[in-house]
Structures are given as structure tokens and as C-alpha cells.
Design a protein with these regions (language model features):
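Cysteine-centered catalytic environments shared across enzyme families
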Residues: 1-300, 322, 326
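Short, amphipathic alpha-helical segments that act as regulatory/interfacial helices
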Residues: 6, 100, 104, 314-320, ...
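Hydrophobic (often cysteine-bearing) scaffold residues that line and stabilize catalytic clefts
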Residues: 13, 92-95, 114, 199-206, ...
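Short, surface-exposed acidic
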Residues: 31, 90-95, 405, 422-435, ...
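Amphipathic alpha-helical segments that form well-ordered structural scaffolds
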Residues: 98, 209, 213, 269, ...
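Peripheral terminal appendages
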Residues: 157-160, 200-201, 205, 209, ...
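ATP-dependent adenylate-handling ligase core
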Residues: 258-316, 322, 339-353, 373, ...
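Mid-to-C-terminal catalytic subdomains of enzymes
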Residues: 325-330, 334-352, 362-473
Length: 527
């Protein structure tokens, strides 16, 4: 994990760049470098994960070409051996050192060949231009904007570009930029033909592909840790990891000091798999004191993203301050693939599939953004096994009639896939879902709402919300978040498509709060 930045022109002197680039130094506190490309700049803040020596420092160079990459290239060692046989020489153990040889061999078609999560900027000396690309899901962040002289700037986070570019835009996942154009090289969610295997075959494939996705993400030269909420998704990641590694893993859970719903479940999972488990407690005052900091590091005003980030950020902060962990595995992206509580209301399998496509396509603005910022702000790398490209493509291709909840249990396919392994206690494997922001303690969301109520009278709320035409705040809580967002990202609200909400066009989903707690089918999931 690291921070990258690239300038196509020299509108800024080298001495002016740190004022913008160092806003994300937490992403790479180990080493920093700004490289002159001749016509512009490539910048790199490093957090060493693979190839820990100084030889792994970027930008990497090859015959005048240069690259900076924030990413993990899975299965890079066989590729490296193939390239070595072709005569390429390598000086480090870094996975990213193979990028320029791959670019020389395959050109722009290289991006579609990568099994990776990445954001990268390449300087091509032959065309004297920058090429940028982002992984198909957008797990690694990348933004862009234009300078007054027409030059383009790429950066890991939006905050790098505030005050530099008039409009800051998220770089679209699954695209590369070359010759002044954005080109789509990957589409994981458009399915041309569904898989019609029987239930047992589908579940066996889900099992095998998820285990493979976890296994890939356990490869690191730096210490590993695991976020464990006690819910199905993170519990599976932890249990599979413990099985694959064959040793005790370090797990971390957080909850409110009063009513931490998930801590007891996380503890049960940790005990079951024999983990070295740490519990972190947060107070109401900590949540309120940290709110502005969290919104500024997230770069969003979305309600559910901010709520869910409070616990995650404070947990990762404790991990950073109290351990040597450099990599954290998390359970994000399962909901988008297998369904939320609200997708139980999908009127048809086709509607379920379209909703899954929308949610996966927009992940980079919501859950993936949350995981990246909360973890990277604490100088740790996030890895997301449910985002494995092979796994995502397969689950999206499963006949939606099989994925719809006709089983009286959400995410049935995922649960059934691991039923015979006994990797988890049955009461965890078959436990109903609770939203993370609720599961750390119902009182946290209630505290945030109550705090927002104290900030505005009803009249002030109605007056102030009218200032915003795009994604207009609709509660005092959403107005509070928007005002803090505008303080750090003035006029940049279109970076986020809109508020994350259930599909209001579905019966049972016309609600005014993103929390599953307001849905009629929430049941016992949050107890």
C-alpha cells in the first residue's frame, strides 16, 4: 500500500508538490520520492509490504519508462520467472517491479491480464505521456483532475487534488487512460450467459474460489492481521486464513463500551479458530470527537459510509498504535454479491441481479472506499478476499434465481458452501446479518443522530439544506456530514454519486435511512 501521484506537465515546481502529495503520507510513511519524467513528475510514498528492502522503492524504471503503482499483483512470481526467462533482470522482491516488463511485452492489453488490485501511473518515454489504470473493482483508489495549463494530474486520493484542480473526479474502475481517453478494459458485472450448475456444484465452486482468493491475499513480507466483526463474512475470512496458514492468527474487533452487539460473536469465532484476539472499545465521546477527522479522510458525505467508518477507523487506529501489523484482511464485498437484508424484497431474480450489478459497479464510492481510507489512514494495507476477480466473476454469473433469498436465510449459497467444513460454529454460520455500524452498538448510530439534532433547529435545517442542489441532505445527520465534507472538499460533491440507500422502488424498501434496522425483515439480526 502506498500513495502515488503523477503530473503530465510541470505546472508545479518540484518544491511545490509536497504541499499536495504529503496529504496522503500516511499511505506510505516508509520512504518518499518525486521523480522528474522530463515533461512532468511521478511521486511515490511507500509502505513496504512485498520486497522490504530499498531496492523495492518506486518509481521503477526500464529504458526510460517509469511506473508508480499502489497495488498487489497476485501470482506475480510465475510471471516474474517467465519474464526472467525472456531476459529481464530484477533487483527487488517487489511484485510491482514486473509491471514495466509486462508493459513492454503486452502494451495496453497488459491491464486485462493482471490478477491484481491496483492503481498505477506509467510514464512512456517514447510518447512522452502518462498512462494510468485502475483495477476492475476500484479496490485501490485513484482520482484525477486538470491543471490550468491543460495538464492532467492523477493521485491516490481526492485530498491530493483539492486546491490544485477545479474539479476532482474518481478514476473509473476497470479503465485505463491513454492518449487523452479513458478506455474500459474489464467489466466484471455484465453477464452474457448465466451458469446453470446445480446447487451443490455452485456451492462447491464458491467454496473453492473463496479459499483461493483468501490464500492469495496471505502472501506478504510484513505482519498480517484480520478484522473480525463476528458476522458471517469476516468470520469466514478469518477461519479460512487460520486453516490455510496452519497457525494462530491475530484478530481484532471493536464495539461500543455499552452495547457492543458483535463483540460476543467475534469472541466466539476467535475462540473457535484459536485466534490471538484483541477487543477494542469506543465511547460516545470518542465517536463524536473523531467524526470530523473521519469525514475528512473519507472524502464522502454518505451516511452509511460514515457510520460504518467510525468503528473501523478507531479499530485500525488502535492496531496501528499497539501492534506491528501492516496488512489487514477484511470481509467487504460479500453483501454486494450475495445480497443485503433489503434485497430480500427484490421483486424478481432479474431485479436482484441488476441490483447486484449496480452495487458492485459502485463499490469504489462506498464500502471499498471506507475500507481503504480507514485502514490506509493508519498506515496499514487493506486486502479484500471477496473482491477476488475470479470469485466476483463467478458469483455474478450464477443464475440469479439461485441467489434470491427463497431459503428463509440471506446469503444461503455462501453459508451452505462452508456448511460441511465446520470452519465456524453453526450459530455463526447461520446467524442473520447485522449492519456493521449497528453491530458495533445500536447506541453509536443513535448518538450520531442525536448529536446532529443539537446542531440545527428545524428551521435552520430547512434553510441550510437548500444550499445544496446535488445530493440534497434530507436529515439533520446528512446535513451535518455534508457541511463537514464541504469544509474539506468544497464543491466536490459529485465525486460521490448519491446517498447509499436501499432500492426505494421495491415494496418494503421505501425508507429514509440506510440502516437495515428500519426494514421490516430485520428481525433478530441485530441482537
Amino acid at each position: 500500500m502506498c500513495a502515488i501521484m503523477g503530473f503530465s506537465t510541470k505546472k508545479l515546481d518540484k518544491s511545490e508538490i509536497p504541499a499536495y502529495f504529503d496529504r496522503t503520507v500516511s499511505r506510505g510513511p516508509d520512504m518518499s520520492r518525486i521523480m522528474d519524467t522530463g515533461s512532468g513528475w511521478l511521486c511515490f510514498h511507500r509502505l513496504a509490504i512485498m520486497g522490504l528492502t530499498e531496492a523495492g522503492m518506486q518509481p521503477f524504471e526500464l529504458d526510460g519508462d517509469m511506473v508508480v503503482c499502489n497495488g498487489e499483483l497476485y501470482g506475480f512470481r510465475p510471471l516474474k520467472r517467465q519474464l526472467t526467462e525472456k531476459g529481464y533482470e530484477f533487483k527487488s522482491g517487489s511484485d510491482c517491479e514486473i509491471i514495466l516488463p509486462l508493459y513492454r511485452e503486452y502494451g495496453l492489453s497488459m491491464f486485462a491480464k493482471l490478477d491484481a488490485e491496483f492503481a498505477m501511473i506509467i510514464y512512456d518515454h517514447k510518447t512522452d505521456s502518462l498512462i494510468a489504470a485502475r483495477d476492475p473493482i476500484g479496490i485501490r483508489p485513484l482520482f484525477y483532475g486538470y491543471l490550468d495549463d491543460g495538464g492532467i494530474v492523477f493521485a491516490s486520493e481526492a485530498k491530493n487534488l483539492i486546491g490544485l484542480c477545479k474539479e476532482v473526479c474518481p478514476f473509473p474502475p476497470g479503465h485505463y487512460y491513454a492518449d487523452g481517453k479513458f478506455v474500459r478494459y474489464a467489466d466484471l458485472t455484465t453477464v452474457t450467459e448465466y451458469c446453470h450448475d446445480d446447487l451443490e456444484t455452485v456451492c462447491r465452486t464458491i467454496r473453492n474460489k473463496l479459499i483461493a482468493g483468501v490464500d492469495k491475499r496471505l502472501d506478504a513480507d510484513a505482519p498480517l492481521g484480520f478484522l473480525l466483526s463476528g458476522g458471517l463474512d469476516s468470520s469466514l475470512v478469518c477461519a479460512i486464513s487460520a486453516l490455510v496458514l496452519g497457525k494462530k492468527i491475530r484478530t481484532f474487533a471493536i464495539g461500543m463500551d455499552k452495547d457492543a452487539i458483535d463483540l460476543k460473536y467475534a469472541r466466539e469465532v476467535a475462540d473457535y479458530i484459536g485466534a490471538d484476539h484483541t477487543e477494542v472499545y469506543m465511547t460516545r465521546q470518542q465517536v463524536l470527537d473523531t467524526l470530523e477527522e473521519v469525514i475528512s479522510l473519507l472524502g464522502t458525505y454518505d451516511i452509511t459510509t460514515i457510520r460504518a467508518s467510525m468503528g473501523m477507523y478507531l479499530c485500525c487506529k488502535a492496531i496501528h498504535e499497539q501492534t506491528d501489523i501492516r496488512v489487514l484482511l477484511t470481509g467487504e464485498i460479500s453483501d454486494e454479491l450475495f445480497g443485503y437484508k433489503y434485497t430480500d424484497f427484490a421483486p424478481s431474480p432479474e431485479a436482484f441481479q441488476q441490483e447486484a450489478k449496480k452495487r458492485v459497479d459502485e463499490l469504489y464510492m462506498y464500502d471499498v472506499l471506507r475500507a481503504d481510507r480507514c485502514i490506509s489512514a493508519n498506515s496499514i494495507e487493506a486486502r479484500v478476499p471477496f473482491g477476488d476477480l475470479d470469485f466476483v466473476k463467478y458469483v455474478m454469473s450464477i443464475d440469479p434465481a439461485m441467489k434470491v433469498n427463497t431459503y428463509d436465510m440471506g446469503k444461503y449459497l455462501l453459508r451452505h458452501a462452508f456448511e460441511k467444513d465446520h470452519l465456524l460454529p453453526d450459530d455463526i454460520l447461520w446467524r442473520q446479518k447485522a449492519a456493521f455500524s449497528d453491530a458495533v452498538g445500536h447506541s453509536m448510530v443513535d448518538d450520531l443522530k442525536a448529536y446532529a439534532e443539537t446542531k440545527y433547529t428545524d428551521a435552520e435545517f430547512e434553510e441550510k439544506r437548500k444550499k445544496y442542489d446535488f445530493a440534497q441532505p434530507f436529515t439533520k445527520e446528512s446535513l451535518l456530514y455534508r457541511e463537514i465534507f464541504e469544509k474539506y472538499y468544497p464543491g466536490q460533491a459529485p465525486m460521490v454519486k448519491n446517498f447509499w440507500m436501499p432500492n426505494k422502488s421495491w415494496k418494503g424498501c421505501d425508507v429514509n435511512d440506510p440502516s437495515a434496522r428500519v426494514l421490516s425483515n430485520y428481525g433478530e439480526s441485530g441482537t
